[in-house]
Amino acid sequence: MGYLVVIGVIACVAYGILQVVSTVLPRLLLVPSQNWQDKIKKEIEQPMVRYLKVGNKRSSYRRRLVLASKQPSFYTNFVNNKIKVASVDSQNDEGEFLAEMKKRDVRDPQRKIIYGFFHPYANNGGGGERVLWQAVQATLATSDRNIVAIYTTNYESDPTSILDKVEAKFQISRLDEDRIVFVYLRKYARLIDGDYWKRFTLIGQLFGSMVLSWEAMFELSPDVWIDTIGLPGSYLLVSLVLKIPIMSYVHYPIIQPEMFNKLKFQGLSQIRVPKLSEIKTDVFSIGKLIYWSGVFYFYKYLGSLVNITLANGSWTFNHISNIWTINKDEAGYEMDILYPPCGTETLTKNVETLGSRENKLLFIAQFRPEKRHSLILRQYSKFLVNATSIGTPLKNIPTLVFLGSCRTPDDTKTLHDLKQEVDDLELNGYVEFVVDCSYEDIMVWLSKVKFGLNAMWNEHFGIGVVEYMSRGVIPLCHASAGPLLDIVTNWDNEPTSVSWYNNTGFFFKDKSDPDFDLSLQSDTASEFLQFSSRDNKDSTSTYPTLARLLDELFITNPDLISETRLQSMRENGVKSVLEKFSNGVFTLKWMQYSNQLGDLEKSYREERRSGIEKVY
């Protein structure tokens, strides 16, 4: 009987919490106080500009002001979290401003929509930010009624400086700045930083993004939620409280089934009674399995709250489509690939596909272990020993150029270790380091070398490879993920009889790859490696090691890199990246999804929000 009482109490508490989340909080965020019109009218009529007294109703007041304003960007909280009426609005053209705030009908063709972009590091200037700002430009271009809210933790930078950086870094200009509202998140920014969580990092960051999303909604609740950075914890409160459409641009899944392969117990069925000497380690392993399983299924649930999922490439799409499966058959749900905008319209301008280039292997990457510079050095050394032993002319031997940046002390240490390895392998005359150079210098390098390297295993996309091909550099890539599936692909579907090269580039694998399977090798001494085919697990594909690939290109079969063939490959590569990775292609596709979100927003208002915005 006592158990029933406990269960009843728990059920009542859970029901009460659900009612608060689904009923009370939406009114807090979306419905202003009953006398809101009088308050705003009073401030408009005041001769001096004063702050509105809105208490904890900041979101609802800011929403109405933003949606009615001729200059929505004025209502940023950069200076402080207080709200005042913009002078352009307080001029109050015969009550037009107040009247505009009352327009709440779902089917009103003039009704404006706030697209909220949740991207805490909006000012960082990386690949994720390029996606963000190209998406912002496309959203604004879709309709004059669209307003964009940027939720950012970069509170040290004012809106103007952020937009100036966007133009300088990504060449994204002509943004309608008046329709971009910056919402600065100051309280909980640290909670999404992986370094903040010394233990249980994944669940900590999920919790942190949930809390940060609450701060975002409390300052300004949007009509559509767009996550362009990969913080799925934000979806929970957005879905439960605001009941609005959610779109997620996924750069990579935060947890994948393959990660369980690292665990001692990969499923409950593998757990056994431990030996006395193994009790401690087994208990820890079981705990780790439970933790990872909990995170995995929570992530799976969060994916069910998303209406439109866009993956940055085939590798991400294949993984996320196998994880976010709960709502696959739901009406209106969509999952697709949308390659990131790489600015190939600009990159391919004046590219030289004719003429000779320097016989160098350029590797552009940050100095981090996962980029596998060390693998390149070891394989290059092996190739060099073979090339010199058979008397290959020095002019036919390519040299290495490592070009990259050091953003952290760890990067600097990696660079130091690589230089030491060059000494140990006696490669000083063959390897050049270019550190922290300018973008202009990078363009010079891309315009003068023949070949570009990429050695990372399962790089989700690989924008560096796109840059190689855009500037006529022939890619030599690790055969995995983005470079294999999306970027270095056969132009114009020209048939090929081998797996390790096509009409745009070359591929290699390595025995150190996590997916290398010794049992598949017919000759363990061979430098041509067998890997399970990505299309048919019962068949295999053959790839050379990097050392063997260099042997093939520069010693055994130099016709593969004759000047005539290289010219053709450059032309194919330029056409390929223009067709798939231009800003224009991204923009057109994003605009389609912006329209879909607008349609979903209407149906959500009618079916899920019960007319709450019409209160007062």
UniProtKB/Swiss-Prot annotation:
Pfam families: ALG11_N (PF15924), Glycos_transf_1 (PF00534). Its main location: endoplasmic reticulum. One of its GO terms (biological process) is dolichol-linked oligosaccharide biosynthetic process. The chain crosses the membrane at residues 2-21. Its EC number is 2.4.1.131. Pathway: Protein modification; protein glycosylation. Keywords: Endoplasmic reticulum, Glycosyltransferase, Membrane, Transferase, Transmembrane, Transmembrane helix. It comes from the Eukaryota. Residues 200-220, 461-481 dip into the membrane without crossing it. Residues 22-199, 221-460, 482-616 are cytoplasmic. It is a single-pass membrane protein. Residues 1 are lumenal. It is found in: Endoplasmic reticulum membrane. GO terms for cellular component: endoplasmic reticulum membrane. It catalyses: an alpha-D-Man-(1->3)-[alpha-D-Man-(1->6)]-beta-D-Man-(1->4)-beta-D-GlcNAc-(1->4)-alpha-D-GlcNAc-diphospho-di-trans,poly-cis-dolichol + 2 GDP-alpha-D-mannose = an alpha-D-Man-(1->2)-alpha-D-Man-(1->2)-alpha-D-Man-(1->3)-[alpha-D-Man-(1->6)]-beta-D-Man-(1->4)-beta-D-GlcNAc-(1->4)-alpha-D-GlcNAc-diphospho-di-trans,poly-cis-dolichol + 2 GDP + 2 H(+). One of its GO terms (molecular function) is GDP-Man:Man3GlcNAc2-PP-Dol alpha-1,2-mannosyltransferase activity. GDP-Man:Man(3)GlcNAc(2)-PP-Dol alpha-1,2-mannosyltransferase that operates in the biosynthetic pathway of dolichol-linked oligosaccharides, the glycan precursors employed in protein asparagine (N)-glycosylation. The assembly of dolichol-linked oligosaccharides begins on the cytosolic side of the endoplasmic reticulum membrane and finishes in its lumen. The sequential addition of sugars to dolichol pyrophosphate produces dolichol-linked oligosaccharides containing fourteen sugars, including two GlcNAcs, nine mannoses and three glucoses. PANTHER family: GDP-MAN:MAN(3)GLCNAC(2)-PP-DOL ALPHA-1,2-MANNOSYLTRANSFERASE. Belongs to the glycosyltransferase group 1 family. This is GDP-Man:Man(3)GlcNAc(2)-PP-Dol alpha-1,2-mannosyltransferase. The lineage of its organism: Eukaryota, Fungi, Dikarya, Ascomycota, Saccharomycotina. The gene is ALG11.
